[in-house]
Each structure stands twice: as C-alpha cells, then as structure tokens.
C-alpha cells in the first residue's frame, strides 16, 4: 500500500497514465495525491478529470489556480482562452457533473500520521496549521455552495496581500485563495508578492520563496506543493517537496513515492512534438 504524490498534470492525460503505469499504481490499494492544476494547457483536461473522479477514495487532491479559473469559465465569469484547450471539457455531456464535483474538492490535504501537508502553491509562513485548516474551510464552503459564482467573480485580484485574523468578507477569501493557489514569493514578514514569477535566483530583493521564510507548519510537517514549474523540483529545504516540473511546457510529470521518497518521472509528450518540429 503506497502513497504517490504527483505534480501539476495540466491536462497531460497520456503522461499521467504512463506514469501511474510505471509505478504500478493500484486503485483501492494505493493512494494518489495530486497537487492541483489538473486542467488547462495540455490536450487532455477532460480525460484527466474523468479519470481522477473515477478513482473515488483512492485519490486526494487540492485545487489549483487553473482549476478555479476553469470553474469561473464554466460559471460564465471568465473567458475561455484557446491556449487553455478547455473547450472539449466545457462542451462534454458530463461537464456539469465533472465541474460540480471539482468545485467540491479541497484546498488543503493533511495526513497526521505521515505528518504531511499538501496545498497547490504551499503554506504561507504567516499561518499555523489550525489557521490554514480554518481558512481552507472558509473557501471550500463557499465553493461548494450555490453562491460560488459570486465568489469566483470576486476572487481575482492581488489585494489584500498580508494576512490578518481581522480580514473579513471577500478580501479574506481572496487572500486565502491567493495564498493556497498563487503564492510564490513573500517579503521577509510573510506578506505576499503576487507579481514575481521567476526563479528564486532572479527574484529582486528582499523577496524570498515562501518556503525560505520560517513558518510554524514547516517546523512540524512536510509540505508538498506544485504551481512553480521554474523551480524544476529543486532548491527547497528538507521536508519541502516541489512537484511541478512543467510537463505541459515540455518538461516532465513527477511522482514521489512517499514511503521511500523515491522519485519517478515521465517525459512530456511535447518533447516528441518539439523534436518533430525541429527535424521538419
């Protein structure tokens, strides 16, 4: 009985299935953890959602920013961008079923026995675990309610960017959403910077990756996250696992088997496309 953690799939269905075959993943016996951003950019978002949903209790996932954007498109709030390749999913006969299932998925996964936490972008150093749990529940409750389009319409924006227990209403929900799904860099006090997307070596001072700022969750738990493909899975402290390795950009899809910390990778099929283009 193994636990497999896989980074951002981004619609790369064929690579996901190949990787699961490589590690001999067995639903019902093994458990699959997914860092979110199941959809967009790759060609198989519909197949990814259908497959992941079919796994039932054998999968534990968290929502990413692209998953939330898909929900906003589905609700008629955001524009369907051709580069996201979401039209087959949005026009599928089971789209309502899939997307209503998706919006009821969590922002945070915790395994107390393994001392393991997963969130798409990570855990802000301004939160302890109890605060993270409460904040995740706040957004999850709205997403699973009938008023979820109202929240999705208001979630876009970079402010507020500093946590306070006094935050209320849509500002509170927006900060929580950004912390769980968009965060990369912070100021030394933990305040979010929502503009920089480069690698840590290229970031302007005084910005630091969120995981480079001491926080109470990382003192007691391992943290697995995706979202940040330019890290290429490297440069994190012990106990912090960056799993997005840019499959949809021609990189790889990465899997970590938790029990022995062994990594497995599946090259992106885009390598074939790029190679064929270069040869032609």
UniProtKB/Swiss-Prot annotation:
<dbReference type="Pfam" id="PF00149">
    <property type="entry name" value="Metallophos"/>
</dbReference>
<dbReference type="GO" id="GO:0016787">
    <property type="term" value="F:hydrolase activity"/>
</dbReference>
<dbReference type="GO" id="GO:0015949">
    <property type="term" value="P:nucleobase-containing small molecule interconversion"/>
</dbReference>
<dbReference type="GO" id="GO:0010165">
    <property type="term" value="P:response to X-ray"/>
</dbReference>
<keyword id="KW-0378">Hydrolase</keyword>
<dbReference type="InterPro" id="IPR004617">
    <property type="entry name" value="ApaH"/>
</dbReference>
<comment type="subunit">
    <text>Monomer.</text>
</comment>
<dbReference type="GO" id="GO:0110154">
    <property type="term" value="P:RNA decapping"/>
</dbReference>
<comment type="similarity">
    <text>Belongs to the Ap4A hydrolase family.</text>
</comment>
<dbReference type="InterPro" id="IPR004843">
    <property type="entry name" value="Calcineurin-like_PHP_ApaH"/>
</dbReference>
<dbReference type="InterPro" id="IPR029052">
    <property type="entry name" value="Metallo-depent_PP-like"/>
</dbReference>
<dbReference type="GO" id="GO:0008803">
    <property type="term" value="F:bis(5'-nucleosyl)-tetraphosphatase (symmetrical) activity"/>
</dbReference>
<dbReference type="GO" id="GO:0005737">
    <property type="term" value="C:cytoplasm"/>
</dbReference>
<dbReference type="GO" id="GO:0016791">
    <property type="term" value="F:phosphatase activity"/>
</dbReference>
<protein>
    <recommendedName>
        <fullName>Bis(5'-nucleosyl)-tetraphosphatase [symmetrical]</fullName>
        <ecNumber>3.6.1.41</ecNumber>
    </recommendedName>
</protein>
<comment type="function">
    <text>Hydrolyzes diadenosine 5',5'''-P1,P4-tetraphosphate to yield ADP.</text>
</comment>
<dbReference type="GO" id="GO:0008796">
    <property type="term" value="F:bis(5'-nucleosyl)-tetraphosphatase activity"/>
</dbReference>
